[in-house]
UniProtKB/Swiss-Prot annotation:
Membrane-spanning segments: none
EC number in record: 2.7.7.6
One Pfam family named in its UniProt record: RNA_pol_Rpb2_6
Self-association and partners: In plastids the minimal PEP RNA polymerase catalytic core is composed of four subunits: alpha, beta, beta', and beta''. When a (nuclear-encoded) sigma factor is associated with the core the holoenzyme is formed, which can initiate transcription.
PANTHER family recorded: DNA-DIRECTED RNA POLYMERASE I SUBUNIT 2
CDD domains named among the record's database cross-references: RNA_pol_B_RPB2 (cd00653)
Subcellular location: Plastid, Chloroplast
The name this protein goes by in its record: DNA-directed RNA polymerase subunit beta
InterPro entries (UniProt xref): DNA-dir_RNA_pol_bsu_ext_1_sf, DNA-dir_RNA_pol_su2, DNA-dir_RNAP_su2_dom, DNA-dir_RNAP_su2_hyb_sf, RNA_pol_bsu_bac, RNA_pol_bsu_CS, RNA_pol_bsu_protrusion, RNA_pol_Rpb2_2
Length: 1070
């Protein structure tokens, strides 16, 4: 962000800035802080001392490039070197060497890390800030009970309670509580100090009897009493050093370490002036907290809102990496201690390099990036997805809440979220409200709070100044909602404006305003800020749109939206998918692979990304946008990336849509489309799949890659080269061999052919046998081979196998079953692809491209799609693009309608087409049935909407099962496409079958095709030879399972078969 106190703000901050700032803070401060905590290590006899000289540590440049790290499944990291010294105390000699501590994964230009060849990103966690919080609850008698909760930096909680007799207790566990006097004495205070440091000494003395005086008579007695209550120990424990250490480890360290943020919060809440470097809970803190609790009892002071953002802190990538680095150093310390004692025991002479191993640091970071819940695989479906993923905030994770235990209050929108956390963009399902997205201007401050910018309005100066404020600062200020004129501060404001004050939204005179917002969508996330006319949509549909834009597939030919919000350029810029000129110069050469330019007398070659696979199998590709011998400026777009056009985000296509029913093919959110979408590659996308195979060294010998595979038909091997690997550029069909591999195995004597046995008997020749373990193309994987990688790791053992990866590109046109969506939560499945001559057509003969159901608009309340549709038609006819800020109704009533209708009227005049804007029903038009040529009865809304093709495609979801695996317990088919599972016939499906009276089909579904073991085998046999399917005589396995489960509850259940002959009842045993 360009920020100046005089000039204001000219650009929005970089969307990846939070990740960059966090990682830089870890390198600048976190590394040094943790290294300074590393202690001097001595042996048991105190003859040798090891220490690190942390002031001159070095981080080396990475040995490999990012691209190579991805292809070879390596970690893009930097080596950490620290000078270390080994001091011999007897001779006072010191040996100093620079030791290699380990590898630290680095952050690339996208704000992500590459670990084992995979893009990983660390998302921000929202935790309860350490400090003290007061709240009030009603007991069973309806009386208010006040409690104060002290939260430590580790997340441990201790509660202070005040009962009816004004006695104060500290709850040390769920069942046990002790007097506040005992706790203060155990922490080192005597009775005189306690009474001198409290505001209500008479209350403390009122509940102090002789027994309590004895307990707090000395520190030892207080510690013993505290230990007895805390550990629930009976008898008379004896004071000892080990008892103090146990208390220190189990209670004080977990519940009394406040950290720098907790110390600051405690000082502010309790009006203390304890030094900032004193990060542990002191007796003064406890006594001041008790004073405030007594004040609450007498109606003084204010209660705390636990869900206010001022009471939350952000655990950013810097904090998480610093914690892991500290953990790695603790492990390194233990390893060095063990190595020193082992060297002295065996009378060896150690050196600093021999003592230090890089394993603790490297394995700690790899396990963190691979296993930690807040370290996630970067979603790279499209450029927007990459940007949004790094700006997520989560209440989940270690120290946080869980999806099942989180209350509604935590999930709900809070007034303090204004400008900090988007009120719209969150996940759907069990994690709703727990995973959010930061607003576009939000940043993380030094104290872990989310800050947002405001214009500060002062009476002395007419110029408004930009200030970043945490949630605690703007709570008691009157904040005017930013309007569209916020960047133009010279314009006179209205006399009365809507404002926010103390978590309430009021209407206040302009003279009383202290702060004002700076941007119309300052309080929205990136995804929500890309929705035009969002103010006309229901928030639930805007939420769906924010999520679905992240699921859009980059198309073969991208297209800019006609109606946008203006943020499309910055999203594309910050995503890093476009190639940007870093210097001004002249283009010397350009092709699909690279761009060569001359700048400042130097020749610079810029490689372009070609057909790179994302982890969602979408195609990332860069296309040059500059021509040879042209001069360029710094910051100019050299090449567009996936889903960008001219440096702007382009996720979908502008297509001609109509809102009308059509023969029921668009009922229930189905969508009818024209065959033009297929034949002209309007919604065609490329997808790249990766197939890999490894070679191991088995006990029978090494596996071989070869093209000589016995017992396989020649046409399956037609695409292999002489090495046994598929050729580049080959067209591959299902079942073809991609990599030929043979695995050696030992065969039994009976399995040899007669000629092999003869050779063994006469000549003693050992005939080797091998099993074919080739890599074959699975079902649905046809396409073109675009890349083959043979990665040979050092060693060649079974622990370092060779890996062969084959990348296959698929061209996917849109088809029935694919999912499409607009930017207003209007989603649907393609139900039918109609010939263009049968589609409804306009009065100028243009056929409609897509037909949506009009009933999907009023009940969903996403009317923004209608405004976009009409304005898009005007923009298409006038060859204009519109960038509209949200909430334009603040200018005047019906501002959106007054924007759209004049544009439609102008388009009607310029194109001489009066049907574009008809005053009787503006925005609608008479259209004709393509099959009969007759006009439809009612005028229809037609226009150009921006439609996205989502990653939920029928090719990835369609699945059929003839036979497969069964669950061991229920004997029913497994669940899921990946397991070749069956289709579930649930309760509602059985009702539907019953409704049509199809008894035999229902019986087949529930018995033969499911869990009737004997019957399903007989069905298979009769189906092959042709015959009648026999009736089953026993119960299916699920019924037998139910009977056994009831028997375990001592309930006997039998079933009987009633024969129609002689009406005999035969009891059957389950």
């Amino acid at each position: 962000m360009l920020r100046d106190r005089n000039e204001g703000m000219s650009t929005i901050p970089g969307f990846s800035q939070i990740q960059f700032e966090g990682f830089c803070r870890f390198l600048d401060q976190g590394l040094t802080e943790e290294l300074h905590k590393f202690p001097k290590i001595e042996d048991t006899d105190q003859e040798i001392e090891f220490q690190l000289f942390v002031e001159t540590y070095q981080l080396a440049e990475p040995l490999i490039k990012e691209k190579d790290a991805i292809y070879e499944s390596l970690t893009y990291s930097s080596e950490l070197y620290v000078p270390a010294g080994l001091i011999w105390k007897n001779g006072r000699d010191m040996q100093e060497q620079t030791v290699f501590i380990g590898n630290i994964p680095l952050m690339n230009s996208l704000g992500t890390s590459i670990v084992n060849g995979i893009y990983r990103i660390v998302i921000n966690q929202i935790l309860q800030s350490p400090g003290i919080y007061y709240r009030s609850e009603l007991d069973h008698n309806g009386i208010s009970v006040y409690t104060g909760t002290i939260i430590s930096d580790w997340g441990g909680r201790s509660e202070l309670e005040i009962d009816r007799k004004a006695r104060i207790w500290a709850r040390v566990s769920r069942k046990q509580k002790i007097s506040i006097l005992v706790l203060s004495s155990a922490m080192g205070s005597n009775l005189r100090e306690i009474l001198d440091n409290v505001c209500y000494p008479e209350i403390f003395l009122s509940f102090l009897n002789d027994k309590d005086r004895k307990k707090i008579g000395s520190k030892e007695n207080a510690i013993l009493e505290f230990y007895q209550q805390f550990a629930c120990v009976g008898g008379d424990p004896v004071f000892s050093e080990s008892l103090c250490k146990e208390l220190q480890k189990k209670f004080f360290q977990q519940r009394c370490e406040l950290g720098r943020i907790g110390r600051r919060n405690m000082n502010q809440r309790l009006n203390l002036n304890i030094p900032q470097n004193n990060t542990f809970l002191l007796p003064r803190d406890v006594l001041a907290a008790a004073d405030h609790l007594i004040g609450m009892k007498f109606g003084m002071g204010t209660l705390d809102d636990m869900n206010h953002l001022k009471n939350k802190r952000i655990r950013s990538v810097a904090d998480l990496l610093q914690d892991q680095f500290g953990l790695a150093l603790v492990r390194l310390e233990n390893a060095i201690r063990g190595t020193i004692s082992g060297a002295i025991k065996h009378k060896l002479i150690p050196t600093p390099q021999n003592l230090v191993t890089s394993t603790p640091l490297t394995t700690t970071f790899e396990s963190f990036f691979g296993l930690h819940p807040l370290s996630q695989v970067l979603d790279r479906t499209n450029p927007l997805t990459q940007i949004v993923h790094g700006r997520k905030s989560s209440y989940l994770g270690p120290g946080g809440v869980t999806g099942r235990t989180a209350s509604f209050r935590i999930r709900d929108i809070h007034p303090s979220h204004y400008g900090r956390i988007c009120p719209i963009d969150t996940s759907e399902g069990i994690n709703v409200g727990l995973i959010g997205s930061l607003a576009i201007h939000a940043k993380i401050g030094f104290w872990g709070s989310i800050e947002t910018p405001f214009y500060e309005i002062s009476e002395k100066s007419k110029e408004a100044q930009i200030v970043y404020l945490p949630p605690s600062r703007d709570e008691y200020s009157m904040v005017a909602a930013g309007n569209s004129l916020a960047l133009n501060r010279g314009i006179q404001e209205e006399q009365v404006v809507p404002a926010r004050y103390r978590q309430e939204f009021l209407t206040i005179a302009w003279e009383k305003i202290h702060l004002r917002s700076i941007f119309p969508f300052q309080y929205f996330s990136i995804g929500a800020s890309l929705i035009p006319f969002i103010e006309h949509n229901d928030a639930n549909r805007a939420l769906m749109s924010s999520n679905m834009q992240r699921q859009a597939v980059p198309l073969f030919r991208s297209e800019k939206c006609i109606v946008g919000t203006g943020l499309e350029r910055q999203v594309a810029l910050d995503s890093g998918v476009s190639a940007i000129a870093e210097h001004e110069g002249k283009i010397l050469y350009t092709d699909t692979d690279k761009i060569v330019l001359s700048a400042n007398g130097d020749t610079i070659s810029i490689p372009l990304v070609m057909y790179q696979r994302s982890n969602k199998n979408t195609c990332m590709h860069q296309k040059p946008q500059v021509q040879r011998n042209k001069c360029i400026k710094k910051g100019q777009i050299l090449a567009d990336g996936a889903a960008t056009v001219g440096g702007e985000l382009a996720l979908g296509k502008n297509v001609l849509v109509a809102y009308m029913p059509w023969e029921g093919y668009n009922s229930e959110d189905a969508v009818l489309i024209s065959e033009r979408m297929v034949y002209e590659d309007i919604f065609t996308s490329f997808h790249i799949r990766k197939y890999e195979i490894q070679t191991h060294v088995t006990s029978q010998g090494p596996e071989r890659i070869t093209n000589e595979i016995p017992h396989l038909e020649a046409h399956l091997l037609r695409n292999l080269d002489r090495n046994g690997i598929v050729r580049l550029g080959s067209w591959i069909e299902t079942g073809d061999i991609l990599v030929g591999k043979l695995t050696p195995q030992t065969a039994k004597e009976s399995s040899y052919a007669p000629e092999d046995r003869l050779l063994r008997a006469i000549l003693g020749v050992q005939v080797s046998t091998a099993k074919e373990t080739c890599l074959k193309l699975p079902i649905g994987g046809r396409g073109r081979v675009i890349d083959v990688r043979w990665i040979q790791k050092k060693g060649g053992s079974s622990y370092n196998p060779e890996t062969i990866r084959v990348y296959i590109s698929q061209k996917r046109e849109i088809k029935v079953g694919d999912k499409v969506a607009g930017r207003h939560g209007n989603k649907g499945i393609i139900s039918k692809i109609l010939a263009r001559q049968d589609m409804p057509y306009l009065q100028d003969g243009t056929p409609i491209d897509m037909v949506f159901n009009p009933l999907g608009v009023p009940s969903r309340m996403n009317v923004g799609q209608i405004f976009e549709c009409s304005l898009g038609l005007a923009g298409d006819l006038l060859d204009r693009h519109y960038r509209i800020a949200p909430f334009d109704e603040r200018y005047e009533q019906e501002a959106s309608r007054k924007l759209v209708f004049p544009e439609l009227y102008e388009a009607s005049k310029q194109t001489s087409n009066p049907w574009v804007f008809e005053p009787e029903y503006p925005g609608k038009s008479r259209i004709f049935d393509g099959r009969t040529g007759d006009p439809f009865e009612q005028p229809v809304i037609i226009g150009k909407s921006y439609i996205l093709k989502l990653i939920h495609q029928v090719d990835d979801k369609i699945h059929g099962r003839s036979s497969g695996h069964y669950a061991l317990v229920t004997q029913q088919p497994l669940r899921g496409r990946a397991k070749q599972g069956g289709q579930r016939v649930g309760e509602m499906e059985v009702w539907a079958l019953e409704g049509f009276g199809v008894a035999h089909i229902s019986q087949e579904m529930l018995t033969y095709k499911s869990d009737h073991i004997r019957a399903r085998q007989e069905v298979l046999g009769t189906t092959i030879i042709g015959g009648t399917i026999p009736n089953p005589e026993d119960a299916p396995e699920s019924f037998r399972l139910l009977v056994r489960e009831l028997r375990s509850l001592a309930l006997e259940l039998n079933h009987f078969l009633i024969s129609d002959k002689n009406f005999q009842i035969n009891r059957k045993e389950a």
